Each structure stands twice: as structure tokens, then as C-alpha cells.
């Protein structure tokens, strides 16, 4: 995978870069694994905005991804590497001997024609899935489960990986992409390797309209709003916020306020907090 830099034909192409899509081998997705997808645009079931700056964007079809890899002891062949508009990682299409097809996250280095398997005693090979207790120390993994059988939830974004540091008792120690070190049950499963499309975060958007294509709306400062819209709003000209500390549009403390519950049960499993 590489990055292609555009020439300065217009202000929108100046310093703009895009993926060259060289690793993509097919243009149309597997029809049986593709569904229409209604995006909530930041609203909850009552239509109230719970996540601001979401809405619009290009229409997308959802690709059903197999995060659980629950078809065990059956090898699968990699048919193609495809683009997925719903994530920044690429996806790989697998075909099992019985004809079933499934999508998985494309691990870095996995090529068409290779075979992957999900098994307790699977070999340490890129794309294979097995329990953490059977993975050697120092191995890079992705798509890691939080709870046994829950399906992969950790390290699913492009270029991410989790490093296995230690094993002790019923837990293994992992270093997450955020540099947080925490304990996970040794019975959780993970996939060997790093998620592909490593250069995804080096791509320069280049213009505001490209962000709108992704369904991200502009972020407006509260100090330039009216008092009815934000606690920071109002005043003549560039007025200060008029408070001892910044707050959210709903009056809750913002910018540095910790949001994790101090008595959360899983806090005892975190050995070192993440780095911001």
C-alpha cells in the first residue's frame, strides 16, 4: 500500500494525498455479505443528538465482518482483498471448503491464495486465530476479545496491534495501541499479525469537503454562539466564556475532565493508564 500525492491543480488538491489502492484486487463486494445500512447521524432512538458533528456523507453499503472467527478447525483460502468504506482498514474475503464466504480484517502481509485457520492449536501465522494462552510472548496480535466468545473488539483499526507481554494465572498482560497495559482473560481469542493499511493515518485530507464526504460536520466553538446555544456564548465581540472553567453545551466540565467511572470493576485490570 502506498500514498499518492496530488499536484496543486486547485487549492483543494494542494498538499492533498490519497491511497493508491494497489492492494485492492476486486472492485465489487460479495453480494451475500453486503447489506444496506442506515446510519444514525449522531441521534439516539428518540432522535436527540447524542454525538455532535455527525451527519451527511456518502451512502455506504455495510460489509458483514467476521470478528468472532467461530468457524474453527476449518481452513479458509483468501480470495480477494477489498476496500471497505465503513473503516480505514482493508478487508479480506475468505472461502471455506463447504463454499461459505466470510470477510475478515486484512492483516498486514496476508496475500491472495494463502490459507488461514481458527483453531486452539493453530500455528503462529499471520491471519490465524487462537486463544491468547497459546500465543508466545512478544507476538503481535489484533482483533482481541475483551470477554471469551464476545468477538474481537481491541485493535481493529488500520495499522494497530497489541503486544503480548506476560502470562500469569488466568490472565495475560497486553500492551494496547494507546500504550495502556492491562490484563485480559487467557481464554480470549486473538488474530496473529498487525492490521493492514498502515499508512492510513498519514493521508492528508486536503479540503473540508472531503471530511463532509465521510459524514463529519464542522465543529463550531461555543464562544462564538449565542447564549441560547452554548454556556460559553454571548457577549460583545470576542468576549471570554465568563466561567472559571470550560464546560460542554450541557454544562458538564470539559477539556481535561476525566470521564471514566472511578469505581468501574475493570479498573483493577489496568496496570498502566493510557497515554494521551
Curated annotation (Swiss-Prot):
Subcellular location: Plastid, Chloroplast
Region annotated Disordered, chain positions: 221-276
Annotated keywords: Chloroplast, Plastid, Ribonucleoprotein, Ribosomal protein
InterPro entries: NA-bd_OB-fold (IPR012340), Rib_uL2_dom2 (IPR014722), Ribosomal_uL2 (IPR002171), Ribosomal_uL2_bac/org-type (IPR005880), Ribosomal_uL2_C (IPR022669), Ribosomal_uL2_CS (IPR022671), Ribosomal_uL2_dom3 (IPR014726), Ribosomal_uL2_RNA-bd_dom (IPR022666)
Superkingdom classification of source: Eukaryota
GO annotations of cellular component type: chloroplast; mitochondrial large ribosomal subunit
A GO molecular-function descriptor: rRNA binding
SMART domains on file: Ribosomal_L2, Ribosomal_L2_C
SUPFAM superfamilies: Nucleic acid-binding proteins (SSF50249), Translation proteins SH3-like domain (SSF50104)
Bias kind Basic residues: ranges: 258-276
Signal peptide bounds: none
Family named by the database record: Belongs to the universal ribosomal protein uL2 family.
UniProt xrefs under NCBIfam families: rplB_bact
Assembly information from the UniProt record: Part of the 50S ribosomal subunit.
Official protein name in the record: Large ribosomal subunit protein uL2c
Organism: Stigeoclonium helveticum
